[in-house]
Amino acid sequence: MSISNSIIPKNIYFIKDNKIYNSLVYGSELDFESICVWLSTGFFLGDTTFFKDLKVLKPSHTFNNGTSTGPEWDWHYAPRNISFSNIVDEFIDLFETIVKDRFNGKKVILPLSGGLDSRTLGIALQNNQLDVETFTYYFQGGHNESYYGKLIADALQYPHKSYVVEPGYLWNDIDRISKINGSYTEFTHPRQAAFLDYFNSLDGVFCLGHWGDVLFDNLGLDNDITFEEEVQILKSLIIKKGGYHLANTLWEVWGLNGHFDDYMNEQLESYLSLIKINGSPNSRIRAFKSLHWAPRWNLVNLEYFRYSHQVEMPYYDDSLCKFICSVPEEYLSSRKIQIEYIKRFSPALAKQTWQEHRPFNLYNYHFDTFPLNLPYRIIDKIRRIMKNKDQVSMNWQLQFLGKVNNQNLYDNLFEKDVLRSLVPDKTVKLFYNLFTKNNPKVYAHAISMLLTLSQFQKNLIINEK
């Protein structure tokens, strides 16, 4: 059986004993070095998994007759001498063709946010005269993202519903949630896991805007930075401080050779050096993200959508990836192409608030700099002070904080006698205390990874019986 992966994979394939599987399988020997990387970042790199004898099929690779070969295509940077207006024209033709090919004749379910990716998709779907329903979800006690979703839906004349991520949903559904993504990323972060049963009640194909913000923006890096500086910038992007502390601690607990920091640097240097893009660190880091971050983190959590319905990700399209490689970084920076697309087709939508730059829109977001944005920041702070509570901005605040949540967290880490076969109670207690008594913001990632590791071990034990 021959199976080929696209430039950004749309499915996860596992390889074991020269066979390929399109569903979760387990290996026999744990890969503790790779698990440490996973703990520090929240996802695996390359083709690594929890096991030494289990790999995944890499991007642009083909599996045939027991062997994986590739890549058939490489990320590169070959900017053309072309005007911005012509680039936008090309984007319009390409993007709307992708949307038409994927959704023609289908009912579409479009999750909306206050950003640009779903807004851009909304216009492309409208231009193709497709049947669309929309929804937005937001944290209870958090900023009301549905406000922006409703503005966008109304401007496009789409029906819209609003849903709230509630405290403590995780504990009643943790087994199902952990099995859906195989524990390959921590499952507290993806809010869509809160709505598995709601998604089942919908009718249509999910149209997801993931990865538009990576393809159509950059980090604004200088072209003359060194390779070593690129590595350290990349390291700062993907490693979580609390996760690094946890990975470093368990590296020593597990008696692994050398030092975790050296191993991590070597891994990043190796992966980054395989991307043959010189003179454009923005392009190379975008390529790294698309080779590792997209398939090993983003794609894993899209399984929560795929659990109930077919999923399409237009920004994952091969032709769009190839297009990006020919666009000058100047045009890719600061979301210029998407902004111009929205302005051309829907000035009314462009006037709606861009959440990232609230209260500004696509015509005046340039004013979102100090001191021009100071009046709004003052008013917003006063509003939050009057509410007399911290605004919820991350899911762990709703799932880990509070008496009932804390008891559930404690029980899952200590009382179920699953995690201690991998991590000593002493180590779990250390990070539990760092989270509950020291710095919850820094150590929320570490505690979430321990919870995910516990569920992985639980599911592994069940699989072995």
Where is each model-derived feature located?
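Generic recognition of stable, solvent-exposed alpha-helical segments in well-folded globular domains
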Residues: K58, N86, E90, L94, ...
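Adenosyl-5′-phosphate
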Residues: S23-G27, D53-L54, K58, I238-K465
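Cysteine-centered catalytic environments shared across enzyme families
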Residues: M1-G168, N172-D173, I177-I180, L451, ...
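Conserved adenosine/adenylate-binding substructure
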Residues: G105-I109, L170-G220, V253-V311
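Short, solvent-exposed helix-helix connector turns and helix-capping sites enriched
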Residues: D17, E229-L234, S346, N439
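ATP-dependent adenylate-handling ligase core
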Residues: Y138-D197, H210-L234, K241-G242, I277-N278, ...
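General alpha-helical segment detector with a strong preference for membrane-spanning helices
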Residues: D117-I123, D213, D217, C321-F323
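Conserved aromatic-histidine-acidic binding/catalytic patches
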Residues: S83, I87, I109, Y137, ...
